[in-house]
């Protein structure tokens, strides 16, 4: 049973199947009571704090593997299946879903889709929206609906797959998902180099755009977490408080990966990089990259020590200037950037002395906006100063249209009320 300490619920409902789940939502609709969907409990801090009393709705009973025609390279599972279980199922057939989800042993399929969580491989492999081809859900009236199907090239009906992805369970409780999957690759390798300044990092990132290689991940790292990482301690060429680490991932056949790592090594050396390395235990380091946003944030969290975690979405050229802004605010902050996609995730070393609102609204949000981006709070276990502006920032989205869609799917506003961007 997922921890629910930070939700205002009196009881948690545990339906055993999709029919029982729909009935539970219909009953809540009739009584006008709030419903809070709960998967693995790994992202319950995301969004505004829930204030409306209601009931939790556990997806723990929805764990069926509905259909897996491996030759068609699609899989249909219920929303309570964990990402680890799904990965093991696919691996047995030489396949995978390359999303890179933190805490995969707890995170559920429904939760991953609802939060639109994408890991370091998004640069080369895409995002959740690229893999969801069919979806079933229950709306705020307890009515079941579905979109897409089990065929990759299915264009029938409304695109509920993309609509529900990232909706935080506010339009419907996801009950079942169909993914298209990919083959496992023969080899995966991580190359790394140390960088002296953000200016030098920007030059290396620009060079990757014209590189003959095709990375699947481009990670720019800095801060206390990465300075103490054993796999990076052997790197030469950088020292001092401004140093960063650039980690690039390649996958494919053994021949392809060997050629790309050799080529990138030569390209980096030509740019003045000293002794780039191939990380020995790529799988272990990769797990640290994937889990970084959730370290210290797995439920239940110690509110006094769990970090404040922020996420900025920018144009890629804004990554290094935003790192500078973060370091000005909190020099020891641990930072991970999916640099090829303009995503920056920061775990602050301490709660801002000037307060969350002033640090974010007055400082970091304008820094993100300067690079056509936005800033979100992924996790703030303290719960302090969690306002719409501080959590969601100045999002440039059509709020009126989004609210109209919300009204159609959830007319009584019982699904995760008050947690998303709707005003």
Predicted regions and their residues:
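N-terminal glycine-rich flavin-associated loop
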Residues: 2-35, 59-105, 113, 117-150, ...
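Short, conserved charged micro-motifs
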Residues: 20, 84-85, 199-203, 254-262, ...
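Active-site beta-strand/loop segments that form the cofactor-binding cradle
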Residues: 26-50
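Anion (oxyanion) recognition and catalysis
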Residues: 29, 91, 209, 269, ...
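Residue-level signal for inorganic ion chemistry
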Residues: 39, 80, 248, 346
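Short, glycine/charge-rich beta-strand/loop segments that flank catalytic centers
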Residues: 40-42, 99-110, 133, 224, ...
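Conserved glycine-rich FAD pyrophosphate-binding loop
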Residues: 47-53, 60, 104, 271-423
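C-terminal substrate-binding/cap subdomain adjacent to the FAD-binding core in PCMH-type
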Residues: 114, 133-300
């Amino acid at each position: 049973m997922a921890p629910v300490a930070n939700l205002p619920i009196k009881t948690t409902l545990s339906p055993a199947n999709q029919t029982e789940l729909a009935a539970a939502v219909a009953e809540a609709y009739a009584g006008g009571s709030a419903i809070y969907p709960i998967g693995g409990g790994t992202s319950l801090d995301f969004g505004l704090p829930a204030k409306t009393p209601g009931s939790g709705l556990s997806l723990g009973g929805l764990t069926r593997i509905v259909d897996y025609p491996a030759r068609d390279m699609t899989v249909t599972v219920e929303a309570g299946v964990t990402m680890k279980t799904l990965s093991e199922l696919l691996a047995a057939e030489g396949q995978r879903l390359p999303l890179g989800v933190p805490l995969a042993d707890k995170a559920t399929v429904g939760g991953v889709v609802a939060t639109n969580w994408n890991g370091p491989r998004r640069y080369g492999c895409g995002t959740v929206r690229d893999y969801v081809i069919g979806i079933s859900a229950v709306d705020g009236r307890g009515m079941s609906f579905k979109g897409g199907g089990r065929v990759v090239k299915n264009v029938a009906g409304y695109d509920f797959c993309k609509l529900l992805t990232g909706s935080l369970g506010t339009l419907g409780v996801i009950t079942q998902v169909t993914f298209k999957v990919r083959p496992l690759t023969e080899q995966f390798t991580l190359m790394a180099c140390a960088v002296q300044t953000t200016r030098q990092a920007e030059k290396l990132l620009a060079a990757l755009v014209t590189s003959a290689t095709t990375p699947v991940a481009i990670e720019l790292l800095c801060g206390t977490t990465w300075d103490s990482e054993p796999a990076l301690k052997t790197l030469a060429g950088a020292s001092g408080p401004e140093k960063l680490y650039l980690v690039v991932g390649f996958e494919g056949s053994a021949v392809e990966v060997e050629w790309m790592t050799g080529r990138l090594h030569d390209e980096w050396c030509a740019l003045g990089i000293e002794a780039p390395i191939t990380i020995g235990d790529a799988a272990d380091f990769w797990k640290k990259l994937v889990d970084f946003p959730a370290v210290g944030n797995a439920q239940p969290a110690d509110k006094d020590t769990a970090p404040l975690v922020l996420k900025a979405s920018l144009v890629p050229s804004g990554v290094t200037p935003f790192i500078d802004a973060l370091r000005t605010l909190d020099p020891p902050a641990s930072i991970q950037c999916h640099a090829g996609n303009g995503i920056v995730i920061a775990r602050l070393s301490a709660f801002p002395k000037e307060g969350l609102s002033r640090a974010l609204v007055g400082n970091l949000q304008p820094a993100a906006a300067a690079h056509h981006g936005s800033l979100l709070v992924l996790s703030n276990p303290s719960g302090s100063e969690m306002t719409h502006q501080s959590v969601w920032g100045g999002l440039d989205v059509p709020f009126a249209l989004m609210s109209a869609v919300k009204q159609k799917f959830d007319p009584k506003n019982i699904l995760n009320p008050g947690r998303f961007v709707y005003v």
